[in-house]
């Protein structure tokens, strides 16, 4: 059975990432040069996929071990210890052998920290001491093996115990021995993390914004995907690029929908595009409705105003929703920080084109 050339569910494999060659090259240069990077972009914008490609490319030049530490929804120091242990337990080869020897000398067994921490408070290990031991083991191992540490959704660790302080205390001595990438989807929090003097990682990483995909990149990806499977994209490629507004995941979701409606040896047309768009609309509507429904009334009003007028401060919208400028400002800033709105060049727009489309069609 044929497989769609437009995967869009979850992070992509390194060889599936397209349209980000320049960004991948920049990351390879920085990580290979041991320059810490803070990669910022909305969720589902391809941060993890891009980092996978970058470390894969780096590995072609210099065999490198990569540790992936995901801090999304981090809740406690114990939670951090478990996630770090899980990330380290996925390593293999000589890196893992060296890591196990060092950890063993600290009476630490990589891979079973979760079970140990879930024992009773009296018999279980101290979470903070465990994090110190894990970070020490990692740092000492990287002195002997080229390593990249990727910390995803790092902003979720802000205010969670002292995990960032502990991490900083161990990483500062091995900055020149490892590539270090911080990734996050909350722009304001990422700025605070690396720009506020009271934060442990103040001025410790070069910020890199992941922008929307250019129109020509999306058009090329769609045409190439169709052609690789004996199909012609026709006008669908341009329609996807226009509707998708540079959103990588949504653009590929639309391309996938159109591809399945196009038989091998044929070409897509306007009818294909309309059918694909309608199918994606129907499939995504329940999730969009649920997402919108849990927002505060003010946030809902701001999103509706942006869709209708391109600005959250339109006087007519403020009167219509009975909102003050101050409440609109607070809601807008929160939506920007959460990655749902983007601003720049005097304009404001929704990050998710399907959400914007749903609001425009469903709400007055």
Task: Give, region by region, the residue ranges found by the protein language model.
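A short, conserved structural fragment
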Residues: 336-346
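Short amphipathic alpha-helical interaction segments
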Residues: 321-338
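Short, amphipathic alpha-helical interaction segments positioned at domain boundaries
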Residues: 354-364
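Helix-loop-helix "sensor" segment of P-loop NTPases
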Residues: 191-242, 263-266
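Conserved Walker B catalytic segment
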Residues: 36, 121-186, 195
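Winged-helix-like regulatory helical subdomains adjacent to P-loop NTPase cores
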Residues: 252-325
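A short, basic N-terminal segment
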Residues: 1-37, 42, 60, 354
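P-loop NTPase nucleotide-binding core
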Residues: 33-36, 40-45, 49-147
């Amino acid at each position: 059975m044929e497989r769609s050339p437009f995967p869009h569910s979850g992070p992509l494999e390194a060889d599936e990432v397209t349209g980000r060659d320049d960004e991948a090259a920049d990351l390879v240069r920085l990580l290979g040069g041991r320059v810490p990077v803070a990669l910022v972009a909305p969720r589902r914008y391809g941060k993890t996929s891009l980092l996978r490609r970058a470390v894969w490319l780096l590995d072609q030049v210099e065999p490198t071990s990569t540790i992936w530490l995901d801090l999304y929804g981090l809740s406690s120091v114990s939670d951090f210890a478990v996630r770090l242990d899980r990330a380290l337990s996925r390593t293999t080869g000589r890196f893992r052998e060296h890591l196990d020897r060092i950890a063993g000398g600290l009476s630490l067994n990589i891979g079973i920290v979760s079970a140990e921490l879930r024992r009773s408070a009296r018999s279980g290990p101290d979470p903070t001491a465990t994090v110190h031991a894990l970070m020490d083991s990692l740092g000492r191992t990287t002195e002997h093996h080229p390593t990249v540490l990727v910390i995803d959704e790092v902003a979720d660790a802000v205010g969670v115990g002292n995990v960032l302080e502990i991490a900083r205390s161990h990483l500062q001595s091995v900055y020149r021995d490892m590539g270090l990438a911080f990734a996050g989807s909350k722009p304001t929090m990422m700025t605070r993390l690396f720009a506020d003097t009271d934060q442990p990682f103040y001025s410790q990483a070069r910020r890199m914004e992941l922008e929307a995909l250019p129109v020509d990149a999306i058009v090329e990806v769609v045409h190439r995907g169709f052609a690789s499977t004996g199909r012609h994209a026709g006008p669908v490629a341009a329609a996807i690029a226009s509707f998708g507004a540079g959103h990588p995941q949504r653009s590929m979701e639309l391309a996938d929908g159109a591809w399945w409606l196009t038989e091998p040896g044929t070409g897509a047309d306007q009818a294909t595009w309309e059918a694909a768009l309608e199918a994606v609309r129907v499939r995504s509507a329940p999730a969009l409705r649920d997402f919108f429904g849990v927002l505060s009334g003010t946030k809902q009003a701001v999103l509706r105003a942006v869709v209708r007028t391109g600005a959250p401060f339109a006087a007519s919208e403020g009167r219509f929703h009975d909102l003050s400028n101050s409440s609109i400002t607070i809601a807008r800033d929160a939506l920007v920080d959460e990655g749902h709105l983007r601003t720049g060049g005097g304009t404001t727009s929704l990050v998710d084109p399907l959400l914007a489309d749903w609001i425009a069609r469903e709400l007055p």
